[in-house]
Amino acid sequence: MEKKHADRLRSKFPESLEGKKLICLQIPDNYQYMEPELVELLLAKLGSYMEIPDNEISFMQRVLEPEVMDSLSEAIEYDSMDFIEVNSAFARSAAALGPVFGNVLDAGTGTARIPIALCQLRPEWKLTCIDLSANMLKVGAENVEKAGVRSQISLELIDAKAMPYPDSYFDIVISNSIIHHLPDPLLFLQEVRRVLKPNGAIFLRDLLRPETREIRDNLVKLYAGDCNSHQKQLFSDSLQAAFTLDEVETMVETAGLERLRIYESSDRHWTAERAWCETL
């Protein structure tokens, strides 16, 4: 683990870790000189603090959930969940960062609720909204039609980790809750850097992985208490698949994205943002 994680563990659990040696590892950017088995092992441990039994320390390790919600029933159920307040707050913040006229990318658009809200705030924007789930986009197309914003929104079935767009194409890149779905978000972040104009704006937001299962369960009760059991499980799984703020900062730095402000924006979210500027 990184030294800062080890130091944090020692400060939070001095008695549990007294006399124990914490090994700090840094995975190199270039894997070609490492044994494939070692690379696989190290990558599998990304997002976890250490291998210690739960009865000794209770930091929650990252557990992946499926990258794509692929069935129509899942897309419909996801769209029915109450994200109005969260989506509206996201749209307001994103709108404040971009230019008056903008070519916008929404990566992992899901059912297009956020771009619809953005169209109402920024009628001059043109939004390219991509997702890897055809059924999410199918529901999204219905939402776009009902909202009457087809002239502003283009929905495309595209992998955000390998986008077909030219370099320096977009004025602003936004994404809500895509990163916790990705096994390796670095590929996506590198693509963001490539397709964004050098002076472009960025607004990324996702869930924070809680430090313990107890905190995770309390968040589920607080924010999904009125949901059905399947929706509660979806939220719980998403929290456990998320990253810590330290991990996000490391990934953003490794991807070469500069001048971003990265911060904990709620008790369950992190945000990475950068305002558009007329010139660098």
Regions found by a protein language model. Give the residues of each.
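Class I SAM-dependent methyltransferase SAM/SAH-binding core
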Residues: 105, 113-162
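A short glycine-rich, Lys/Arg-flanked "PGG" loop and its adjoining helix->strand segment in the class I
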Residues: 187-198
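Conserved alpha-helix/loop element of class I SAM-dependent methyltransferases that forms part
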Residues: 84-102
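Conserved beta-strand signature within the Rossmann-like core of class I S-adenosyl-L-methionine
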Residues: 200-206
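Short polar/charged helix/loop
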Residues: 1-57
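C-terminal alpha-helical "lid/dimerization" subdomain adjacent to the S-adenosyl-L-methionine
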Residues: 207-255, 261-264, 269-271
